[in-house]
């Protein structure tokens, strides 16, 4: 079975437990914390995946790092991943869990590229407008400042891209001038 399929199974199981307990939001935030710890501390993953490290040492490190800081269900999932030598799947598990949780709540993540930072009011307006377009109740907007787009906005929601940036328009104009207009 591929790692992707295995990660999905762990995420679905964790999601179902979160649903039973009504803890979607807290699970998402705790899993994001775990993801950040693993991304910021590559040595942690190296230690937990090293074949010569004893399982008891791995458990002790997990307890020191996460016990009492995350829900017991999440902690137990980490222990199972370590015991089954699957801890390297933690980031895909977190991403899939987050996706399942957001889908259940009709939430989508949107990455908005702009030449300057957006105000909260602008983010709220974009959230309302584009949430309707993609059939979601709410968009969680992450603003990425990219001066290279010159002006306007470029929005990525899932696999959809809405490019209203000046750079995007200049790129289209350049292509048309080089190869002729599209029919």
From Swiss-Prot:
Q: Which gene encodes it?
A: atpH
Q: Where are the disulfide bridges?
A: none
Q: Which InterPro entries match?
A: ATP_synth_OSCP/delta_N_sf, ATPase_OSCP/d_CS, ATPase_OSCP/dsu
- Briefly state the protein's biological role: F(1)F(0) ATP synthase produces ATP from ADP in the presence of a proton or sodium gradient. F-type ATPases consist of two structural domains, F(1) containing the extramembraneous catalytic core and F(0) containing the membrane proton channel, linked together by a central stalk and a peripheral stalk. During catalysis, ATP synthesis in the catalytic domain of F(1) is coupled via a rotary mechanism of the central stalk subunits to proton translocation.
Transmembrane ranges? none
Ion transport as UniProt keyword: yes
Q: Which PANTHER family match?
A: ATP SYNTHASE DELTA CHAIN (PTHR11910)
Protein localization: Cell membrane
Q: Identify its membrane topology class.
A: Peripheral membrane protein
Q: What is this protein called?
A: ATP synthase subunit delta
Q: What is its main location?
A: membrane
A single Gene Ontology MF term assigned here is:
proton-transporting ATP synthase activity, rotational mechanism
Q: Note the PROSITE patterns from the entry.
A: ATPASE_DELTA
Against Pfam families, the record matches this protein to: OSCP
Q: Which family does it belong to?
A: Belongs to the ATPase delta chain family.
Cellular component annotations (GO), alphabetically ordered: plasma membrane; proton-transporting ATP synthase complex
Q: Quaternary structure? A: F-type ATPases have 2 components, F(1) - the catalytic core - and F(0) - the membrane proton channel. F(1) has five subunits: alpha(3), beta(3), gamma(1), delta(1), epsilon(1). F(0) has three main subunits: a(1), b(2) and c(10-14). The alpha and beta chains form an alternating ring which encloses part of the gamma chain. F(1) is attached to F(0) by a central stalk formed by the gamma and epsilon chains, while a peripheral stalk is formed by the delta and b chains.
